C-alpha cells in the first residue's frame, strides 16, 4: 500500500472547496491516513520547496504558499502517487483534462489548487516533513 502527500493550496482553501477535493480522493480509492490544516511560515515553505531554490519562480512560490492556510494530507492506497497525480491533472489548469482537480478548481499555473508528491521517494520525504509517524493512522 503506497502513501503520498497531498497539499490543498491557499487558493483552494480560500474558495472553500476542501471537501470537494477530499471527495475526489476518497471516491477514487485513496484513504486519508493523516490530515491537518496549517499556516506555513516563509521558512517552512522555503525548506519544503528547496529543490526549486534556483528557479525564477521560487520566491513567488514561497509567497503564495504562505498567503493563507493549507491542508496537508497523507493519502494511502494502491499506486497512491500515480493515482493522486492523475486526479490532480496537469500543473497548468489550462492543460488539465476536464474532471481533474486542477481543471475544476485551479485559477492558474501559480494558483493551481493542489500539490502531490511526484515519486515514492519524495512522498516519504514530504510526509516526514509535515507528519510524525504517530500521526499517520
Swiss-Prot record:
GO cellular component entries: cytoplasm
BP terms from Gene Ontology: CTP biosynthetic process; GTP biosynthetic process; UTP biosynthetic process
Main location: cytoplasm
Residues reported to bind ATP: 9, 57, 85, 91, 102, 112
One Gene Ontology term of the molecular function aspect: metal ion binding
Keyword list, A-Z: ATP-binding, Cytoplasm, Kinase, Magnesium, Metal-binding, Nucleotide metabolism, Nucleotide-binding, Phosphoprotein, Transferase
Places the protein is found: Cytoplasm
Coiled-coil spans in chain: none
Subunit and partners: Homotetramer.
Protein name: Nucleoside diphosphate kinase
Name of encoding gene: ndk
